[in-house]
Amino acid sequence: MVRAGDTLKRDSLKGDTLKGDTLRQETAMNRRHVLNMAAAMAAGLPFWPVRAFAQPAGPAMTALSAYMSSAARRALPAEADEHAKHHLLDTLASIISGSELGPGQAAQRYIRAHGGQGSATVLGTKLTASPVDAALANGVMAHADETDDSHNASRTHPGAGVVPAALAAADQLGCDGAHFLRAVALGYDVGVRVVLAMGGYEFSYDSSHAAHSIMSVFGGAAAAGSIAKLDPKQMRWMLDYAAQQSSGLVAWRRDKDHIEKAFVFAGMGARDGVTAALLVHSGWNGVDDIFTGDDNFFQAYAPKAQREKLIEKLGERYEVALTDIKKWTVGSPIQAPLDGVDLILRKHPFEAAQVRRVDVHLAPASAAVVDNRDMPDICLQHMVAVMLLDKTASFHAAHDKPRMLDPATLRERAKITLVYDEELTKLLPVRVAIVNIELADGTRLSERVTAVRGTIRNPMSRQEIVDKARDLLVPILGRDKAERLIETVYKIETVADIRTLRPLFQPEH
């Protein structure tokens, strides 16, 4: 097994030598470039710059690709294994519940009209499609709303891109349960690390490129490539094709129906990740190291990237164990404010009619994402109003768009002010919220939330995760099938072929 730490030590020891060699090579290439250009101009011939086409893989890529190739044979530590099962169940529930929402319905219309022929399952439906199209549809359904998991440091939604890609590859190529779970965990590790290398949450906030889609294409490719049993060289080529397809712009913030957002966050990346894996599995080759050398990925997207983060604590730090599961099925920046209102209500119960004013403080970058949005589940003012009225924020309430025009809800919403608090920027990437409530009798109540329920600093229990999944699954699958799916996920290592689970993903009618 290649240890990331050992690789980094070797890199450090060889650093000066590598820099010296690189400088000498660049000097020689520049000298040849000038001489060739002068000769061509003297002869009256056109001149094209000379490029170094064949460039070997660097040490980080070598370690990363070796780790990726061996992941299927390496057992997960007990804690990572448990977390991987939590996130698998949570994402399956997100996909299946998302099948009945607007973006999910849009994905199914596409499959019916244009989806390729194939046997890959479109969850929550009786539809099947090609693995590429199934990954697209399941990815869109996974992020059809704000139910799926999120990784705070990278500002991404790993499960929604990784799990659909893994499912599609497993449907196409076959895979047992233990291998499947390890492939999913690998997807989290690779996709998240690419974004962390690019700058993590700072890249997410400062760039017009969508970190979410970048995570999904690399994470989806890693999971699918593991299921395809690609060797280290093939893994490097696959990452090349993932990079070539990497795209997405934060213009998704202007999306009013969550359809484009679902495509950018998950559907596109899952589709493209599976494509990258299947291209190489079918015999394609590619560039050995897309992360270094001429015109590399980081040069194009994040020139200040820290490549060493690609393999930082790889095999020691499992990103699936550092990913949050949402207690509330709403946009991530709304989680802490809802926790704050919930905590205040538990300590000092009151009715909505007693409230005079509510001030919610968020860091400006977080506030901008959820400020008076058109969709209920990503509109902070609306969801806080719902919490005041209902004393909770259910899945149904978070997706009840007509309620945004309800007079009683609008009356409470008018009491709510979102404060862009620069002081909270200093605490990022931790999303801290301050909720101040003033009652009509002058009583002032306040709560500062620094660790949202479901985050790694305040994790949900297995029972809470099961309860959330059950609430999402039962309306579509029925209680019996939902219970069997939950039970199967927590003993997935006993499943001989993931394809046998298809009936558990589909409604009875």
Regions found by a protein language model. Give the residues of each.
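N-terminal secretory signal peptides
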Residues: 1-30, 55
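Hydrophobic alpha-helical transmembrane segments of integral membrane proteins
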Residues: 33, 83-84, 157, 161, ...
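Well-ordered alpha-helical scaffold segments within catalytic/enzyme domains
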Residues: 97-98, 166-173, 221-228, 276-280, ...
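Well-ordered alpha-helical segments within folded domains of soluble proteins
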Residues: 159-167, 216-223, 270-275, 336
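Glycine-rich, mobile lid/loop segments that gate access to catalytic sites or pores
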Residues: 174, 178-269
